[in-house]
Amino acid sequence: ALFVGLAGCTEQVSQFQLTRPVSSLNSYQHAIVSIHGEGLDITTQYGFRETTEVMHKKIVSAIRPTGLFNTINGDHDGSSQLEVAILITEFRYVSGPKRSLAWFFANDAILGGLIQLKDKDSGKIVGEMSFIEKSGDQKAMLSDYTGKQINKVTNLTLALLTTI
């Protein structure tokens, strides 16, 4: 009876919205990927640092084979740079093992914020997308955990960079 009472309490949410479409990225030879949290209540949470490190690696690895940029997070020759900035505004960490083994005790995994493409010199935003990922409990132990949400944000970032 406890199992039935806990299941189906919250729904999974996976939403994104293009808030500023990208016109062209042809003028950028170099990219810098940065990930930040909005405020101490986000950045001091358990799992935040690990999440940003994994997300940074995945985004850089996803961008590199596209050939869009000569360098990513490296030295540049003075030509224009594009900052791929992720601002995390909502966050709650849930690990994969916790989701699998103790899903009925795990809270919803939450990862939300903004993906901004900025001209590094002027600070002008040349593309922007908002996103929110919440795990819910309808899929029980198969619900998303933070690692799956990182993969979704990586895919959204790549989509923003490559869709014109």
Which residue ranges define each predicted feature?
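Sec-dependent bacterial lipoprotein signal peptides
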Residues: A1-C9
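A structural "domain/chain start" motif
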Residues: G8-V60, E128-I132, L161-I164
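Surface-exposed short loop/turn segments
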Residues: Q12, G74-I125, S135-A140
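A short amphipathic beta-strand at an alpha->beta junction
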Residues: H30, F69-T71
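Soluble non-cytosolic domains of exported or imported proteins
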Residues: Y46-K57, F105, A140-N151
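Sec-exported extracytoplasmic/periplasmic mature domains
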Residues: V60-L68, Y93, L158-T163
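Short secondary-structure boundary motifs at beta->alpha junctions and helix caps
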Residues: D121-T163
